[in-house]
Amino acid sequence: MTIDITEIMDLIPHRYPFLLVDKVVEIDPNKSITGIKNVTVNEPQFTGHFPARPVMPGVLMVEAMTQLAAILVAKSLGSTKNKEVFLMAIENSKFRKVVQPGDTMHIHATIDQQRANVWKFSSTVKVDGEMAAESKFTAMIKDKS
């Protein structure tokens, strides 16, 4: 099952310039998800990071991983219309390859553990089949107030 950008925008609240998942290419609810982010030179972060040699900031790669995980949560629960997903912890992030405009980030997230409203994930970003980044993180799912 694929999920296009229109449905992604129904599932998570992020918008330009902070929406960092372009498409979901595979999903197994309650287990894992794979998506893509096409990195383009016209994104605002490249104005300052770095003008002479644009490089995707590592923190935005982690953000893309967490957004993909939030989509997995929404599909696993059936909906997150009345829920909010909050990041609680980021652990063991490693950045192994420079990501730059023209690259396609292949992002994968797996649910490692779910207890009540706390979910733990492992995630990777690959470019051209090579590991670019990896991280583990924890999120809390809360009812909207």
From Swiss-Prot:
Residue positions of the active site: 49
EC numbers for this chain: 4.2.1.59
Task performed by this protein: Involved in unsaturated fatty acids biosynthesis. Catalyzes the dehydration of short chain beta-hydroxyacyl-ACPs and long chain saturated and unsaturated beta-hydroxyacyl-ACPs.
Subcellular localization(s) per the UniProt record: Cytoplasm
Record family assignment: Belongs to the thioester dehydratase family. FabZ subfamily.
PANTHER family (UniProt xref): 3-HYDROXYACYL-[ACYL-CARRIER-PROTEIN] DEHYDRATASE
Catalytic activity: a (3R)-hydroxyacyl-[ACP] = a (2E)-enoyl-[ACP] + H2O
GO biological process: fatty acid biosynthetic process; lipid A biosynthetic process
Disulphide connectivity of cysteines: none
GO molecular function: (3R)-hydroxyacyl-[acyl-carrier-protein] dehydratase activity
Origin: domain of life: Bacteria
NCBIfam families the record matches: fabZ, PRK00006.1
Keyword list, A-Z: Cytoplasm, Lipid A biosynthesis, Lipid biosynthesis, Lipid metabolism, Lyase
Protein's name according to its UniProt entry: 3-hydroxyacyl-[acyl-carrier-protein] dehydratase FabZ
Keyword Zinc: no
Entry GO terms, CC: cytoplasm; membrane
